[in-house]
């Protein structure tokens, strides 16, 4: 099944654009609980309210030699009707890029992955050639330092354009399999609106809601397409750690349901 088709089906099933980030932090998890058990309970509690899950590979790499096993088993826990996106931000050349793609899209069998465009098309091609997978290119990120490079102006097709605009245009040109999307932060509302108007058919993976300060109402208004779709709204800490102790899973379920419902409230205009 093509990524966009699966995304639409998952969104319709749960009436949701919400994507929960599975970022297990031992300092915030219940004392004595393993990352695998934490993830399992979070998935079971939140699955009715989401379109999918975003797994930040760094949190698993930080767990040492057992991290990959936890990551793999976490992917297996996620219901197959929901999407799984590996937040890996990979970007390298030649066989290295091919190996990254195999690890994430074959071995883990994730539905999508985040990639960095800094090394150019040949670094992304091994991912893009997985025609049924969603390839999300970092375009305009939610962190403060994004302006260091992404907002620089450069000459492109005879015009002065911001670098993030060049990335978006290149992504659109590379989208021959209709499997490419953009990562655009919810902290960049003016630019988010501009990108959506320019690329109404690309899915946007949108981090930055909650702890990073992104406004949910503005994100839905600016980040969805004319049908109120093609935006994957990411939330992690505000859901995973909504409550502490033994009630963490119930707290996550309630937080996910509330965010799903808030998103749908703002989608009503569509």
From Swiss-Prot:
- EC number(s): the record gives 4.1.1.23
Q: Mark the transmembrane ranges.
A: none
Instruction: Give the disulfide map.
Output: none
Q: Which InterPro entries match?
A: Aldolase_TIM, OMPdecase_type-2, OMPdeCOase_dom, RibuloseP-bd_barrel
SUPFAM superfamilies in alphabetical order: Ribulose-phoshate binding barrel
Specify the pathway.
Pyrimidine metabolism; UMP biosynthesis via de novo pathway; UMP from orotate: step 2/2
GO MF terms here are: orotidine-5'-phosphate decarboxylase activity
What is catalyzed by this enzyme?
Answer: orotidine 5'-phosphate + H(+) = UMP + CO2
GO annotation, biological process: 'de novo' pyrimidine nucleobase biosynthetic process; 'de novo' UMP biosynthetic process
What would be one Pfam family of this protein? OMPdecase
Keywords noted in UniProt: Decarboxylase, Lyase, Pyrimidine biosynthesis
Where is the catalytic site? 89
PANTHER family recorded for this chain?
OROTIDINE 5'-PHOSPHATE DECARBOXYLASE (PTHR43375:SF1)
UniProt family annotation: Belongs to the OMP decarboxylase family. Type 2 subfamily.
| Name of this protein | Orotidine 5'-phosphate decarboxylase
Please report the organism this UniProt entry assigns to the protein: Dehalococcoides mccartyi (strain CBDB1)
Its gene is: pyrF
